[in-house]
């Protein structure tokens, strides 16, 4: 049972980290690369499957969309955040590729 709890805690932390990446992705945040690297390292070391990352992304985008609608704003700009997901998955592929050739 504790392994399941640990997994849930890890997933919540990853979701929180990914939220920070999303919020700063289109800004000039100089720490963004470090945030992405930290996230990728955590995902890689924990052996989190790619569909889980996609699910985290979709959940957060859905939350953002609901918030924008509550504020009376459109959510068209959220489509741009697909780039964030593509970037994260590309970094993860590089981590896997690097691990294979070591």
From Swiss-Prot:
Keywords: Biological rhythms. The keyword Transferase does not apply. GO terms for biological process: circadian rhythm. PROSITE patterns: KAIA_C. It holds the Pfam family KaiA. Gene3D superfamilies: KaiA/RbsU domain (1.10.1240.30). Lacks the N-terminal pseudoreceiver domain (PsR) domain found in some cyanobacteria (also called KaiA N-terminal domain). Belongs to the KaiA family. The KaiA C-terminal domain mediates interaction with KaiC, homodimerization, and is responsible for the clock oscillation function. This is Circadian clock oscillator protein KaiA. It comes from Nostoc sp. (strain PCC 7120 / SAG 25.82 / UTEX 2576). The gene is kaiA.
